[in-house]
Design a protein with these regions (language model features):
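Active-site loop and adjoining helix of the penicillin-binding protein/serine DD-peptidase-beta-lactamase fold
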Residues: 175-218, 233-316
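Periplasmic/cell-envelope proteins involved in peptidoglycan metabolism and beta-lactam response
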Residues: 1-236
Length: 316
């Protein structure tokens, strides 16, 4: 019985702090960084220390000013009966400096890692997003989460009744294991060109959505992939959730005109037709008991075979 009580007492004195692993970097095919991890500070509180100082209201007020948070919300957090609680995660450098200068009793900063996408909106639908806890939520950051997420570590500290660390007491440090990096088939330059041209098309045509894919026909590698509307994964909460939908892979499409190039290539390879052969399009053609029309029912007139493919002519 005595051993059991001693073990319980020790458990009550132990505080465990999770150390988040750094996510692996996502590179394009040429080694250019598309998604990286950067260090940032997060604000935490040890309520027992604040209670001992009798300055709960003062601490809440000063934190609210620096963190731009509701004072009551902070007060409720720092007066909870817990040994450790987050106040605000991943604050900027200026905020960290202000908090260090305030040196508030029971308030501390813990270095964490957050995801950063240095190219902004570029390849956002490919890369996806990561949440506040540094876990993948969408795109490749979600698909490869186990690979690039790493393994979190932790610090276990023994503290006294008011939450202060006990010198030379029981401590345990398990370091985090950072995630592996990933190299994509995506080419940043080709991705930029695709997105630039896609934006032009969207501006001209005003569609509800648009997407584009560039593939190496010899290997099947995807060199670029983009979807519109777009978003910045660094601040994805500022955009409608629908902007994150990747129309290039999430939606099903009838093959339609995309198969014409296959038929055309086969015909040219078998010498059934040459690029210079000419065709006349009156706007429609009767096949068996059906009449097939070109888009919009308009006539393309006289064209060579290259123009037939260019205009996606159903008659030609």
């Amino acid at each position: 019985r005595g051993d059991e009580l001693a073990e319980r007492a020790l458990d009550n004195r132990m505080r465990e702090i999770t150390l988040k692993a750094k996510r692996g970097t996502i590179f394009d095919r040429n080694g250019r960084e598309l998604a990286i991890s950067v260090s940032t500070d997060s604000v935490y509180a040890v309520p027992a220390q604040i209670e001992k100082s009798k300055k709960e209201r003062e601490v809440a007020q000063k934190l609210a000013e620096v963190l731009n948070m509701d004072e009551k919300e902070i007060y409720d957090r720092i007066t909870r009966q817990v040994s450790f609680i987050w106040i605000k995660r991943q604050v900027d450098l200026e905020t960290s400096q202000k908090l260090r200068e305030l040196d508030l009793e029971g308030i501390g900063l813990l270095e964490e890692s957050r995801r950063f996408y240095p190219k902004g909106t570029l390849a956002s639908h490919v890369l996806g997003i990561s949440g506040i806890d540094n876990t993948g939520l969408d795109g490749l950051d979600l698909y490869y989460d186990q690979l690039i997420g790493g393994t979190d570590g932790k610090i276990v500290i023994e503290h006294d009744a008011v939450g202060r660390e006990i010198p030379e007491a029981t401590h345990r440090y398990i370091p985090p294991v950072d995630g592996s990096s990933v190299v994509l088939t995506i080419d940043e330059t080709i991705q930029y060109i695709l997105e630039r041209e896609l934006d032009k098309a969207v501006e001209q045509r005003q569609p509800k959505a648009a997407c584009g894919i560039v593939m190496d026909p010899k290997t099947g590698e995807i060199l670029a992939l983009a979807s519109r509307p777009n978003f910045d994964p660094n601040r994805y909460n500022d955009y409608p959730a629908g902007n994150r939908r990747n129309f290039a892979v999430h939606d099903a499409y009838e093959p339609g005109s995309t198969m014409k190039i296959v038929t055309a290539a086969a015909a040219m390879e078998e010498d059934v037709v040459k690029a210079s052969d000419r065709f006349h399009c009156p706007g429609s053609i009767k096949v068996a008991n059906r009449r097939i029309s070109c888009a919009g029912g308009t006539s393309h007139g006289s064209m060579d075979f290259t123009e037939v493919v260019e205009h996606s002519c159903n008659v030609g």
